[in-house]
Amino acid sequence: WLIKLGGNFNDVGFMGGATNKRCHRPTGGAAVGPEVVKTLYNAVEARKIDLRTDSQVVDLIVKNGAVAGVKVKDEDGKVYEINSKAVVNAAGGFAGNNAMVSKIIPRLKGFATTNHPGATGDGLLLSEKVKAAFVDMDQIQTHPTVVETTGVMVTEAVRGNGAVLINKEGKRFFDELNTRDAVSAAILKQTTGHAYMFFDDDVRKSLKAIEGYIKMPGMVIQGKDLDEVAKNMGVPAANLKATMAQYAKDQAAGKDSCCGRTKMERPLTKAPYYAILVTPAVHHTMGGVKINTKAEVINVDGKVIPGYFAAGEVTGGVHG
């Protein structure tokens, strides 16, 4: 559908937990999000759809038991109504609302998030008012590779294209392409609960998204060789050199003696070298309103709420 709208999603690569290349992304490995937004925005503009920014939906309008519009607060605080035949709730999840997240899973209290500030769960609260049913609210996913100080998520494609995870001791410790929950748990067990995403120049050149990280001040540690990058990372150079020598040997043999990784795209021997300090952060709230195969919202009695539809992360039982 996105490709039909003009989006560029022709590159297909590995992601965590995958046995085959099935994750679509822009040609050359550019970031997926901006391409999705650009594609949808262009489609909206071409169809002259009324797009209202700095506006907050504060309530649903219900007439004769059916959802028939919304009440909106504009940037000046004025509330007005939009009447419609139906309403589609695509307000996203609640990963940006740590109070809501930690109420459901206390151990995630204080965690950073990869999400934008608007991911506060407002769409769920609106749905609660019309007695919508909820499903899988306790299924909250962390992304394992996030820069703690900025909330910048380092795309899984970096690992998919060959990067490894190195701890503060200069050693690998887990299969980097395992599922997100497993990789997150493994990182949290390391010293300070952090790890370095480590890769060489071949990986850098394979993925346009990395260029964006390098342009971010202080995000990417670099070194002309393993000794220099180890010094800049603050890890034992001897350990890092031994780790990477073993990895290159394992990659050539096609068998990972350390961690059982089955997809080793590159030997990681092409200087210069790069590292990004990462830790897990709340990424994806998989629970939400219950819908049927027509995207109609179901209420607590198991019946369709007329005129009310939902799509995306605001829904539950669909993602993951």
Where are the regions that the model predicts?
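Rossmann-like flavin
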Residues: 1-16, 223-225, 231-240, 246
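Conserved redox-cofactor binding core of oxidoreductases
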Residues: 1-80, 97-100, 251-270
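Short Gly/Pro-enriched turn/cap motifs at secondary-structure boundaries
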Residues: 21, 27, 114-117, 153-156, ...
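A glycine-rich dinucleotide-binding beta-alpha-beta segment and adjacent secondary-structure elements
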Residues: 59, 239-318
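Hydrophobic "anchor" residues
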Residues: 67, 172, 297-298
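Glycine-rich loop(s) and the adjacent beta-strand/alpha-helix scaffold that form part
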Residues: 75-147, 151-152
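Short acidic/His/Gly/Ser-rich catalytic and metal-binding motifs that mark active-site loops
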Residues: 95-101, 206-208, 317-319
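An anion/pyrophosphate-binding glycine-rich loop and adjacent beta-alpha core
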Residues: 124-126, 132-235
